[in-house]
């Protein structure tokens, strides 16, 4: 199919057979899996997935691609295509033990990752191709430059595995940046205390609002220096020096 990639959807189509096989190996789809693909595009992953699965749900926003995907011989009786923007979908409607995969458009990857956390109780695992810089941010340890809001929120909810890099030449058209594959597995037994997720997201967003300022400055009016000291948290540190567990402590304190 001749399809002109649409900039507004951030479309770059995966072409490289070796990379496709490596992604499939990482996902390891089993026939009865409850699997959902976000942004199937021209079906580079969709077609080999359908060959292994009894059924696949896919969410695609592009009307031209919707028609193309439903007409694929391998789709017949197996592909449940949802014509929608993934940022508007209730993922829990597809049942429990959902396995989510996708080559996520660069322009919506961060908001989509945060959005998916709302449905984490329905999800078994997620495998995504993302801009390499985004995967580095997700996997970053505290005290590093890449560590930020995305690192805290995703590591609170999931075990993060940075799997491998994907070069620009694996795509058509070639993106200007490298990509990478990440596996996100929701914690079945969390290493962190349970906390109100909205409170955590709010405190993390405020803490990272100005990265060069100290935690005390960024959280002024929310928590005092003496209260931070009582929690054993150094208010003189910058936000990227505060661990996920410490952000959980802060969110818990504010919730109370």
Curated annotation (Swiss-Prot):
It is found in: Cytoplasm. GO terms for cellular component: cytosol. S-adenosyl-L-methionine binds at residues 12, 14, 39, 60, 85, 103. It catalyses: adenosine(1518)/adenosine(1519) in 16S rRNA + 4 S-adenosyl-L-methionine = N(6)-dimethyladenosine(1518)/N(6)-dimethyladenosine(1519) in 16S rRNA + 4 S-adenosyl-L-homocysteine + 4 H(+). Keywords: Cytoplasm, Methyltransferase, RNA-binding, rRNA processing, S-adenosyl-L-methionine, Transferase. It holds the Pfam family RrnaAD. The keyword Cytoplasm applies. The keyword S-adenosyl-L-methionine applies. It is an enzyme of class 2 (transferase). One of its GO terms (molecular function) is RNA binding. SUPFAM superfamilies: S-adenosyl-L-methionine-dependent methyltransferases. Its EC number is 2.1.1.182. Its main location: cytoplasm. Belongs to the class I-like SAM-binding methyltransferase superfamily. rRNA adenine N(6)-methyltransferase family. RsmA subfamily. Specifically dimethylates two adjacent adenosines (A1518 and A1519) in the loop of a conserved hairpin near the 3'-end of 16S rRNA in the 30S particle. May play a critical role in biogenesis of 30S subunits. This is Ribosomal RNA small subunit methyltransferase A. The lineage of its organism: Bacteria, Pseudomonadati, Pseudomonadota, Gammaproteobacteria, Legionellales.
